[in-house]
Swiss-Prot record:
Domain VWFA stretches: 273-439
Protein name: Uncharacterized protein MJ0811
GO cellular component, one term: cytosol
SMART domains for the chain: VWA (SM00327)
PROSITE patterns the record matches: VWFA
CDD domains cross-referenced by the UniProt entry: VWA_YIEM_type
């Protein structure tokens, strides 16, 4: 027996399907062969450790594969593994994701500990004094290192899966497509970081949207008939205490003929679309870029719930990329495309703002738009443009919200902004300021 973890045909099929569709795992297995000649079975057993509901070790294992048992014993005998397994058991994509992340970190730690040669020697000659204990410790520390990130990546992956789904839309990706999507996210470190951040910010955006709904009471302005029990008139409530009238109440409830308040709710009024201008200049590279893209993508969730279109513009010293987005039909490829792009030039505010103006003028549906500018840059805006943009805003009822990331706002941009948001650090809560301003 080469596998150290007991598994059945269903488990084997799940692993083989993940391996077949994950080019990244195939690449990792090929690469790790230089460190651990029995790496392929280690990856397979790691998958079973995350996937199976009950994990048991095989009693009889070929001698040279017993080293994998030491590694996985170290990995699974800790609370971090148990927490991760809650997210991965019986889900082949999540289990495969955790497998990739464990293997990446384990072999990185193995290299740092300079145990590669010892492991190779053990695999070929069966010699390696104290090696099992060292590997157990490395595996244990690896699990501690990745546990939080596994949770963040899976949460982010779920966020990406849920984009483009309207209310009540239960269409699911096939297992093969889910694996390929996870593959795209995992093999690009920057996209992985953006998706991790997106998972948190999407939940924050949803909570902010729901908070506005929850705390808005509306204004009573008439009565009507229906069956909304939250808005019953007092005289209808009294009927519930009378045995005879109670049955009349039920009949009228079924017929939607109860007397209720009619609520004038401002939230029901159609809001304008959102034009996002995201700075892609050289100074945004790194954490600011990741935060900015995650914020931009998380706004799609608010737009979807409020039935608002989005127009996305990436700029540096010019407009480099633009795309009109329907939040209810956005594809995974579009999300990956937005997350992947980066340009790295200088900073110019006039060109993206001019493009935003053109979009609003060209598209009737983009009147009353919120223009959201996210930047860490400094670029002056001339007086001629200031007057032109101010006039434009009044004519088309547009609103400019300028977000300055870890920098001070320029005076000229402040002059034409309806709202200025200063982000002093890249904490998740800072994004809440933006969600409040657009929702």
């Amino acid at each position: 027996m080469k596998n150290i973890i007991k598994h059945d045909a269903y488990d084997k099929k799940a692993y083989e399907r993940f391996l077949k569709n994950s080019k990244y795992l195939q690449k990792l297995i090929s690469y790790y062969s230089q460190y651990h000649p029995i790496h392929e079975k280690l990856a397979e057993d790691t998958f079973y450790a995350f996937f199976k509901y009950v994990v048991e070790f095989n009693e009889y294992v070929e001698e040279k594969f017993k080293i994998n048992k030491a590694i996985l014993e170290g990995a699974i005998k800790n609370i971090e593994y148990e927490k991760s397994k809650l997210l991965t058991e019986l889900d082949e994509v999540n289990a495969g994701t955790a497998t990739i992340m464990f293997c990446e970190k384990f072999f990185e730690n193995l290299k740092l500990a300079k145990l590669n040669k010892e492991l190779k020697k053990f695999a070929s000659e069966g010699k390696g004094e104290g090696l099992e204990d060292k590997l157990k410790e490395i595996a244990k520390n690896t699990m501690k290192d990745i546990a939080e990130e596994v949770s963040e990546v899976i949460q982010g992956f779920n966020a990406v899966e849920n984009f483009g789904k309207g209310e009540g839309d239960k269409k699911l990706l096939s297992p093969e497509d889910r694996i390929k999507l996870a593959d795209k996210i995992l093999q690009n470190k920057k996209i992985r970081e953006i998706v991790k951040k997106l998972g948190k910010l999407r939940l924050l955006a949803i909570n902010e949207y729901k908070s506005k709904i929850k705390h808005y009471s509306g204004e009573i302005y008439s009565t009507k008939i229906g069956r909304d029990l939250k808005h019953l008139l007092p005289k209808e409530i009294v009927n519930l205490s009378d045995e005879i009238l109670y049955y009349d109440f039920l009949r009228r409830f079924v017929d939607k003929k109860l007397l209720i308040y009619d609520i004038q709710n401002k939230l029901e009024k159609q809001k304008g679309p959102i034009i996002i201008l995201l700075d892609h200049s050289g100074s945004m590279y790194g954490d600011r870029e990741i935060w900015g893209k995650a914020v931009a993508l998380s706004i799609i969730e608010i737009a979807k719930r409020e039935n608002r279109d989005i127009y996305y513009i990436a700029f540096d010293d010019g407009v480099r990329f633009e795309k009109k987005i329907n939040p209810k039909t956005i594809t995974f490829d579009e999300i990956i495309e937005i997350a992947s792009l980066y340009f790295g030039g200088g900073t110019n505010f006039i060109m993206p703002l001019n493009r935003a103006m053109s979009i609003i003028k060209e598209h009737e549906t983009f009147k009353n738009a919120d223009i959201l500018l996210i930047t860490d840059g400094y670029a002056e805006v001339n007086d001629v443009f200031l007057k032109e943009f101010d006039k434009f805003k009044n004519e088309y009822n547009a609103k400019l919200i300028s977000v300055f990331v870890e920098t001070f706002p320029t005076e000229t941009l402040k002059a034409i902004s309806d709202e200025v948001i200063k982000v002093y650090d890249l904490a998740d809560e800072e994004a809440r300021k933006i969600y409040k301003s657009i929702s």
